[in-house]
């Protein structure tokens, strides 16, 4: 499930209204269809990707957290989601100020994140500084460096 495809299927305007939020939540539940108790609880989740980093950036600002903070709690995520989904101008202003390029996908992505939190009964999200692409690239570079023959001096 991706936040952009979810946005395209469920949201009619730039930011989701009540009807769109309902459609988003139903679509997320239907797509990530896991029966209650099927997953072992995990207190800690690790977020790798742009949505997780953007959510953390907004949480830092909204909750006045330090710039070097790399995590947020379930309560903070729920509070931030409630604020962003509340339909107030301050919410869209915050997104536009901090993550304008994610204006369409941030709320759908955060609702996915919130759903995953609930499935695992997670208490905290730690957000990686780097995404999957960076990790793959580093792995390829490091692997190539170890395969390179060394010249003697």
Label the predicted regions.
Residues 1-153:
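Helical "lid/coupling" subdomains associated with nucleotide-phosphate turnover
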């Amino acid at each position: 499930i991706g936040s952009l495809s979810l946005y395209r299927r469920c949201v009619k305007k730039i930011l989701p209204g009540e009807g769109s939020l309902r459609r988003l939540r139903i679509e997320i539940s239907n797509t990530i269809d896991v029966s209650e108790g099927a997953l072992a609880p995990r207190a800690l989740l690790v977020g790798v990707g742009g949505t997780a980093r953007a959510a953390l950036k907004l949480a830092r600002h909204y909750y006045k957290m330090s710039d070097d903070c790399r995590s947020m709690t379930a309560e903070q995520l729920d509070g931030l989601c409630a604020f962003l989904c509340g339909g107030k101008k301050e919410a869209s202003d915050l997104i536009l100020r901090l993550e304008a390029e994610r204006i369409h996908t941030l709320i759908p992505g955060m609702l996915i994140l919130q759903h995953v939190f609930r499935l695992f009964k997670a208490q905290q999200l730690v957000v990686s500084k780097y995404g999957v692409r960076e990790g793959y690239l580093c792995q390829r570079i490091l692997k190539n460096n170890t395969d390179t023959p060394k010249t003697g001096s």
